[in-house]
């Protein structure tokens, strides 16, 4: 029956929080208004005085512990204890547990019947047998009573009635005593074999087995407010249980104290139930009091029955597999309970009823040891309770409680069979007299319960024996109790029109015939449903609304402000693939993950892709659904594909088939066997640079000075001295490019920042995303050029890293500082709008030079040549005539547009420039300059005032020194000799083009941008301006080279890990700050790889047909040259100044991440071969322990180097607070991983590994498994020893 509270909005705040915890506690406590429990308490006080007061207190504390654990299980797991037991144990075990719970309920109902019968006897003076019949017949009234309560909000009304009855009960017992005597000599414990029977009866009266299952079920029906965390709700339940059971103990103490004073001190013998009730004689003297007493018992009986009706049905269905109506359940229990009551009345009379009341409590106590094992095991199971697993202290208390129950039971059984105490003699005497029922029942109950206890003790939970099959992850705020839905989206198209709106605009996603769907099984938390979201795009400014999902959250955010001058309907095709698979909750591997990703803001295609990992079980093993993504480029008929590794299928649009693919049965934790082997090899290769197999620094690392992890290295310092306010020139050529890359943040670095308009030609060169990963120091950010060619609005602009001020109107059509290949579509669309498709095609075939002075008239189309260029890392295979050893660095980005003004002079120099120009494009590592002609041609037509300045120059204000620049280059260019820019000229030494010779004095022999984030210390970037007072002088302190090499090696290692099949699992764990930082670094590298792949494929697709065969061949090589992309990407290390995470501390965090991941894999690994590989890696990583855990470390905050567009955030990635700043860490994940955390994980790994066994009689089972376990156990012991000594320091 579904229950509910009254409207919570009308209740005070205290009641709204207290009722969900008080309700289940009160409904459970009403079962203690039971004559059987009174009889046990009074019997203990009458026979042993105050000796049993302290044991009764201990029993009460054990009851509080058991009920709290039961409630905690219900709150945390969202399932009741019976359901979990049915999942964790086999059918027969569950059946025996169900029988025990049913016996406990029948015993409670039996005592209730006897109590009601006694009340009717006292009230009306009828025969006791008749009263038992009448008490049994009241079960007929139960359906009416239950129906009435169902109509009147059963939970709330039942709770109120239970609370009222408990108050009456407590008040009646307390006022019946003229005074409450307290023993002044303490509460002595004098236990003996004679008190074993009384102890067992008190234990059964304090703890009832069926309440464990009932309480966890009632908790689910009394859900609290959604804004209360599980931890707070568990605490509320604890205090509610503590208060209620404290009141119960107070009543029992009063009864025992009174019995001790009345019977024990006077030597009277208590034989009948009326004698026990004589303790409350002051109350029973009034007929009204007797009537109230009978009504209390009557309603308590029905409330108990209703409680069982609400929660006990789960016990019958989960354990006994019985699905019967509620009224039939009630009638069955009542009939079974009436039979022994009538038998006792007919054979033994009033004395027999009293003995039967105590007998039922003893029988319940015999069931306790076997009943608490599932409760304690589940509450302490990490697989079931996850983070809410009980503490070690509570586990110890649970163990002591169990041992105490078992000890009392053993003493009782031994005394009952072999002892000579009075109660044992009476039982055996009744047997010899022919009445063997009670003795036989107790003996059978004890033996069967003991056997079940042994079976449960030897049978682990299923989740503990299948660590690699099931891990239950419940969210902190929401409980997942229904079957999980695995969603793979179906394809539909949506049409979206952009219009000019402010922040208050609303996002509208409309599809053909249907609106955007909302998934019913995804809980929207911490999101304002009224928050307006605007998705707008224009020709010049492209902003993409962030659509994020993180666990159970769906958050929509939009850019703060939009600036548009031209708006036109832009139809975007949004592909959403969806297919639904229902996976039962017992097979769920983890919480459902839905990734909603969007393409880059420059593209006009948004892909919303679902990324799901759900586990499916079959007869042979586990298989995983792969992640698929399909992304397209507008204007291209072919989809983006890549021939790279299959693990990047979500990046490049291709999913590999075969190997450890979707159909592989060798999947483990998201990684196939081959991927796990490659993971271990990659990590072993990386850490092998630093440490040997003993965790000691290698000699090679010392020689190369790579052992720098213990030194706090700082990035290089840059001092910027601005002596003048105006500049007639700026950094030119390569020097200018380098400075520009530091001043201008690339799209790859910050894709969604506001574009900055200016007339700086060099800033719009062909620099690509990864090449902008050099150090961007904050001091250089403010050294922003101001010249006559800049507008007033632009000159007042300041830059802070990748955050720019708003664009001015005159620079509206200028593209961002970094032009990626995948921006070509946006540029072409702009041209098409102004000129039409035919004009566009003509321009693409033969673009005319903008200015005759910028280059020869027969130069080759840069777009045509760039389409077929091949990415190179190192010397080019083909070199231009007259150039020797043409070495191109990825970081010294030589834009294609530079050839229009570098060395084109008259005469032989002009002729040499023609041939050299043609070959240059094939050896350039950068293709981004291909967009230059079209952009500037477009700008020249849109802005007439730029006719003389727009082109492929490299200065801020070319009008200031353009003439001297060209005269300088022309004068030094000879027909066959070395060009003048091979030397640093006095006037404009920085205005050199690219000429690479084997001359040791050549500028290009040093590869200046291979340094760590900044230029070589021998380079003075401002030297091209001479010694003028208004120049910028940079004092550069070269960083330690080993640090840069180490960080570059780290980047390569991350890229290799990302290429592993199923690598998403590695970077989707919710761990500490170190792991979170590495996950962010990986997300950044993943995004860069995605950008590179899209760019390469876009160029290859666009340039396939209209160009030369040699270009097509080069383009195909480029598309397949994945290794070249990787090497180019990691040829530098980003650095954004002070606070940047790219320092040696990042390597320490990576070491912690590696230890954590290897231990996670070892926890589920069952192959000795991979155990050995993990052992190698763990041996090397011993060197990290001292650095990571010897002293407390503060977590590094994410910097701008880790910024990625929110549209590319994966579901498990940390949420982005806004479009500019890096995402903040999640609450609770801001602490570094401690040694204690790893120690707990190591203990789990040891337990898991010890259970792995191979097939006996085989080489694997007899040799590989024992040897692998021995080696892995050895290194784990060393880790435990080292981490134990570092535990205090790391906390």
UniProtKB/Swiss-Prot annotation:
- Keyword entries, A-Z: Cytoplasm, Endoplasmic reticulum, Glycoprotein, Membrane, Nucleus, Phosphoprotein, Transmembrane, Transmembrane helix
Q: Name one GO molecular function term.
A: cadmium ion transmembrane transporter activity
Glycosylated residues, chain numbering: 227, 550, 891, 1027
The family note in this entry says: Belongs to the NRAMP (TC 2.A.55) family.
A cellular component term, taken from the record's GO annotations: endoplasmic reticulum membrane
Q: Give the sites modified to Phosphoserine.
A: 647, 664, 923
Instruction: State the protein's name.
Output: Ethylene-insensitive protein 2.2
UniProt source species: Populus trichocarpa
Query: Where is the region Disordered?
Result: 498-518, 614-662, 742-768, 787-808, 836-856, 1210-1229
Residue ranges with Polar residues bias: 635-653, 759-768
Q: Which InterPro entries match?
A: EIN2, NRAMP_fam
UniProt comment concerning the protein's domains: The N-terminal (1-562) region seems to be regulated by upstream components of the ET signal transduction pathway, and may in turn regulate the C-terminal region. The C-terminal (454-1291) region regulates downstream events of ET and jasmonate signaling pathways, and can confer constitutive responses to ET. The nuclear localization signal (1276-1283) is required for interaction with ETR1.
Annotated transmembrane regions: 18-38, 48-68, 96-116, 128-148, 155-175, 195-215, 231-251, 253-273, 288-308, 335-355, 356-376, 393-413, 441-461
Name of one Pfam family that matches: Nramp
- Phosphothreonine, modified sites: 818
């Amino acid at each position: 029956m579904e229950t509910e509270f009254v409207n919570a909005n009308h209740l005070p705040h205290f009641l709204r929080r207290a009722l969900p915890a008080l309700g289940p506690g009160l409904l459970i406590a009403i079962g203690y208004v039971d004559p059987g429990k009174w009889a046990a308490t009074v019997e203990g006080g009458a026979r042993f005085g105050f000796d049993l007061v302290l044991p009764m207190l201990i029993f009460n504390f054990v009851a509080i512990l058991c009920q709290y654990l039961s409630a905690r299980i219900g709150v945390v797991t969202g399932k009741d204890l019976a359901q979990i037991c049915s999942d964790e144990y086999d059918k027969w075990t569950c059946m025996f547990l169900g029988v025990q719970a049913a016996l406990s309920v029948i015993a409670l109902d039996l005592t209730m019947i006897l109590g009601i019968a006694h009340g009717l006897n006292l009230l009306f003076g009828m025969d006791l047998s008749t009263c038992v019949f009448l008490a049994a017949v009241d079960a007929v009234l139960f359906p009416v009573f239950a129906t009435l309560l169902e109509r009147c909000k059963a939970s709330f009304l039942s709770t109120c009635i239970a609370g009222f009855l408990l108050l009456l009960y407590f008040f009646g017992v307390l006022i019946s005593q003229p005074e409450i005597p307290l023993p002044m000599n303490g509460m002595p414990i004098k236990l003996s074999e004679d008190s074993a029977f009384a102890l067992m009866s008190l234990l059964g009266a304090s703890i009832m087995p069926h309440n464990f299952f009932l309480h966890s079920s009632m908790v689910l029906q009394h859900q609290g407010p959604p804004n209360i965390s599980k931890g707070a709700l568990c605490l509320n339940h604890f205090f509610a249980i503590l208060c209620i059971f404290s009141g119960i103990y107070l009543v029992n103490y009063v009864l025992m104290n009174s019995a001790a004073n009345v019977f024990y001190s006077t030597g009277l013998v208590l034989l009948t139930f009326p004698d026990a009730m004589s303790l409350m004689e002051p109350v029973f003297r009034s007929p009204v009091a007797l009537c109230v007493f009978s009504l209390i018992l009557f309603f308590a009986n029905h409330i108990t029955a209703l409680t069982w009706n609400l929660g006990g049905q789960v016990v019958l269905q989960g354990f006994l597999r019985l699905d019967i109506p509620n009224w039939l359940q009630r009638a069955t229990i009542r009939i079974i309970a009436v039979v022994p009551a009538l038998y006792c009345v007919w054979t033994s009379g009033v004395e027999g009823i009293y003995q039967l009341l105590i007998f039922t409590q003893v029988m319940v106590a015999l069931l306790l040891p076997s009943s608490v094992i599932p409760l304690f095991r589940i509450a302490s199971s990490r697989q079931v309770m996850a983070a809410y697993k009980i503490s070690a202290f509570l586990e110890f208390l649970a163990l002591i409680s169990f041992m105490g129950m078992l000890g009392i039971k053993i003493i009782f059984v031994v005394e009952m069979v072999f002892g000579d105490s009075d109660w044992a003699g009476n039982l055996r005497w009744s047997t010899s007299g022919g009445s063997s029922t009670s003795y036989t029942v107790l003996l059978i109950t004890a033996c069967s319960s003991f056997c079940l206890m042994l079976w449960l003790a030897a049978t682990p939970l299923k989740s503990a024996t299948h660590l690699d099959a099931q891990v239950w992850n419940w969210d902190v705020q929401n409980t997942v109790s229904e079957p999980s839905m695995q969603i793979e989206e179906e394809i539909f198209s949506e049409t979206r029109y952009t219009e000019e709106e402010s922040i208050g605009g609303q996002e509208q996603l409309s599809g053909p015939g249907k609106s955007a769907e909302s998934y019913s099984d995804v809980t929207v938390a911490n999101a304002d449903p009224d928050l307006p979201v605007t998705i707008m795009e224009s020709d010049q400014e492209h902003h993409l609304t962030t659509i994020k999902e993180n666990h159970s959250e769906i958050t929509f955010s939009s850019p703060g402000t939009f600036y548009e001058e031209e708006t036109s309907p832009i139809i975007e095709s949004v592909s959403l693939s969806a297919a639904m698979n229902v996976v039962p909750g017992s097979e769920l591997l983890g919480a459902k993950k839905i990734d909603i990703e969007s393409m880059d803001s420059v593209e006009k295609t948004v892909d919303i892709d679902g990324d799901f990992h759900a586990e499916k079980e079959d007869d042979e093993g586990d298989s995983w659904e792969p992640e698929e993504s399909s992304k397209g480029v507008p204007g291209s008929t072919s989809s983006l594909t890549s021939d790279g590794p299959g693990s990047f299928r979500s990046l490049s649009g291709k999913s590999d088939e075969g190997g450890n693919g979707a159909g592989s049965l060798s999947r483990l934790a998201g990684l196939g066997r081959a991927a796990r082997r490659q993971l271990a090899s990659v990590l072993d290769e990386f850490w092998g640079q630093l440490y040997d197999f003993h965790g000691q620094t290698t000699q090679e690392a010392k020689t190369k000075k790579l052992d720098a992890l213990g030194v706090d290295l700082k990035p290089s310092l840059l001092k910027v001295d601005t002596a003048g306010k105006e500049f007639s020139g700026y950094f030119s050529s390569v020097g200018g490019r380098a400075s520009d890359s530091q001043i201008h943040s690339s799209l790859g670095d910050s894709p969604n920042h506001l574009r900055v308009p200016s007339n700086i030609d060099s800033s719009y060169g062909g620099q690509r995303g990864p090449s902008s990963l050099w150090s961007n120091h904050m001091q250089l950010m403010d050294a922003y050029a101001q010249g006559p060619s800049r507008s007033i609005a632009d000159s007042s602009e300041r830059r802070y890293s990748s955050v720019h001020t708003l664009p001015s109107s005159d620079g509206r059509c200028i593209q961002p500082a970094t032009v990626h290949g995948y921006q070509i579509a946006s540029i072409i669309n702009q041209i098409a709008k102004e000129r039409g498709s035919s004009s566009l095609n003509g321009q693409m075939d033969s673009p005319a030079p903008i200015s005759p002075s910028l280059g020869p008239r027969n130069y080759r189309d840069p777009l045509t040549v760039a389409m077929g260029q091949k990415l190179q890392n190192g010397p080019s295979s083909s070199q231009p005539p007259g150039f020797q050893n043409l070495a191109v660095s990825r970081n010294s980005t030589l834009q294609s547009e530079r050839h229009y003004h570098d060395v084109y002079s008259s005469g032989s120099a002009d002729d040499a420039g023609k041939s050299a120009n043609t070959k240059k494009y094939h050896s350039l590592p950068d293709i981004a300059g291909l967009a230059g002609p079209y952009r500037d041609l477009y700008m020249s037509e849109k802005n007439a005032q730029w006719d003389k300045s727009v082109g492929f120059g490299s200065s801020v204000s070319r009008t200031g020194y353009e003439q001297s620049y060209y005269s300088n280059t022309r004068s030094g260019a000879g027909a066959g000799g070395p060009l003048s820019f091979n030397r640093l000229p006095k006037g404009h030494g920085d205005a050199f083009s690219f000429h690479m010779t084997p001359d040791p004095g050549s500028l290009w022999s040093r590869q200046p941008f291979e340094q760590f984030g900044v230029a070589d210390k021998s380079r003075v970037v401002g030297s091209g301006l001479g010694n003028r007072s208004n120049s910028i002088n940079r004092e550069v302190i070269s960083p330690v080279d080993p640090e840069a090499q180490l960080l570059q090696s780290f980047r390569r290692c991350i890229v290799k890990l990302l290429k592993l099949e199923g690598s998403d699992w590695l970077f989707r764990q919710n761990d500490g700050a170190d792991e979170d930082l590495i996950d962010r670094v990986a997300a950044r590298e993943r995004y860069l790889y995605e950008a590179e792949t899209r760019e390469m494929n876009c160029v290859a697709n666009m340039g396939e047909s209209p160009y030369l065969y040699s270009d097509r061949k080069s383009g195909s090589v480029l598309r397949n040259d994945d290794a070249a992309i990787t090497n180019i990407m990691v040829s530098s290390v980003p650095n954004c100044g002070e606070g940047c995470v790219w320092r040696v501390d990042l390597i320490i965090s990576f070491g912690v991440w590696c230890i954590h991941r290897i231990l996670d894999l070892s926890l589920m690994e069952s192959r000795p071969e991979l155990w050995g590989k993990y052992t190698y890696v763990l041996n090397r990583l011993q060197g990290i322990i001292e650095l990571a855990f010897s002293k407390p470390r503060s977590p590094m905050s994410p910097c701008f180097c880790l910024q990625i567009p929110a549209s590319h955030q994966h579901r498990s990635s940390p949420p982005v607070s806004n479009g500019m700043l890096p995402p903040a860490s999640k609450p609770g994940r801001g602490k570094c991983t401690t040694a204690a955390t790893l120690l707990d994980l190591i203990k789990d790994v040891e337990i898991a590994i010890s259970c792995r066994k191979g097939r006996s009689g085989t080489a694997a089972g007899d040799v590989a498994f024992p040897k692998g376990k021995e080696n892995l156990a050895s290194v784990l012991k060393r880790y435990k020893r080292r981490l134990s000594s570092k535990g205090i320091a790391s906390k």
